[in-house]
């Protein structure tokens, strides 16, 4: 099910609702196991706080007496402390004022930084809904780089976090909480930067160093459900996405398909093979793929060139 709107408001969710209503007609002892985070990129923005209450109210209405909300509350996850707080409170009282719960948590947990982080949440939520881009549990920040994570909004988010850090600069505990909560934004900046050929590589290096230092400082052990650690991510990022001495001879080459990729890859296939950018860890991140058959294509380099090896 998509996660940018409640279960009742999207097609896949409505299939679930229909099944839930069927079960509730014959049972008052139902358990729901609800997935509520991005398992591919746990340390990335996942602004779904606005749907929590309606979904929990739906469960209660349909005789759900046991609710396991799997939101992977690991260190560094997107506002994982507040997510656990709000879900717990709404389980006890599905009719509580959800916005008031958010304010209560932020005021107590972030102190004077709270107003800026509240703005951050609300602006990103609005941008997500306005973009029309779905939010799902195997997502990538790259999917949202023209929507809620577009360049203008990323600048706004950075400014809000800068103000939040400044507001609690004299309180070590509060400052570290803000810095920990900033990691998902910084991770998304790194992920998007690696897909932009004209991105500021020195800025990416500096941000990567900060991300590496902060994840170690705050004990962030994993970035996804595969348990890939931040340190490994940073090593691979430097190797794959930051400039190397060697340039690809196939950069910008014309691609002639003998066997076309699967339909879901064709939109980016011509560029993805020759843009000198590595694909990410999931298929939505610049993969070009064939299923059940071999890849066949011609790369036209435009002129004769000498080369010593081929890598993919």
Where do the model's predicted regions map?
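Enriched - but not universal
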Residues: 26, 36, 95, 139, ...
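Acidic/glycine-enriched edge-of-secondary-structure segments
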Residues: 1-8, 282-286
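Structured mid-domain segments that build the active-site/substrate or prosthetic-cofactor binding neighborhood
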Residues: 3-115, 119
């Amino acid at each position: 099910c998509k996660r940018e709107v409640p279960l009742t408001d999207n097609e896949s969710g409505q299939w679930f609702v229909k099944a839930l209503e069927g079960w509730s007609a014959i049972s008052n002892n139902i358990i729901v196991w609800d997935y509520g985070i991005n398992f591919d990129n746990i340390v990335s923005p996942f602004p779904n706080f606005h749907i929590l209450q309606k979904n929990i109210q739906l469960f209660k209405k349909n005789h759900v007496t046991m609710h396991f909300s799997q939101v992977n509350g690991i260190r560094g996850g997107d506002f994982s402390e507040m997510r656990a707080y709000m879900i717990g409170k709404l389980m006890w009282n599905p009719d509580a004022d959800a916005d008031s719960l958010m304010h209560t948590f932020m005021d107590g947990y972030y102190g004077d930084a709270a107003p800026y982080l509240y703005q951050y949440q609300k602006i990103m939520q609005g941008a997500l809904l306005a973009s029309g881009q779905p939010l799902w549990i195997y997502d990538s920040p790259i999917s949202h780089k023209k929507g809620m994570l577009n360049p203008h909004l990323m600048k706004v988010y950075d400014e809000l976090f800068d103000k939040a850090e400044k507001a609690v600069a004299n309180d070590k505990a509060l400052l570290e909480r803000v810095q920990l909560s900033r990691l998902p934004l910084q991770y998304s900046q790194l992920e998007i930067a690696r897909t932009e050929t004209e991105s500021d590589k020195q800025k990416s290096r500096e941000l990567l160093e900060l991300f590496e230092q902060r994840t170690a400082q705050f004990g962030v052990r994993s970035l996804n459900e595969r348990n890939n650690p931040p340190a490994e991510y940073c090593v691979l990022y430097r190797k794959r996405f930051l400039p190397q001495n060697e340039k690809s001879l196939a950069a910008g080459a014309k691609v002639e398909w003998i066997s076309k990729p699967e339909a879901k890859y064709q939109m980016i296939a011509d560029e993805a093979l020759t843009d000198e950018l590595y694909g990410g860890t999931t298929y939505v991140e610049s993969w070009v793929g064939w299923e059940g058959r071999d890849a066949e294509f011609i790369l036209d380099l435009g002129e004769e060139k000498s080369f010593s090896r081929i890598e993919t």
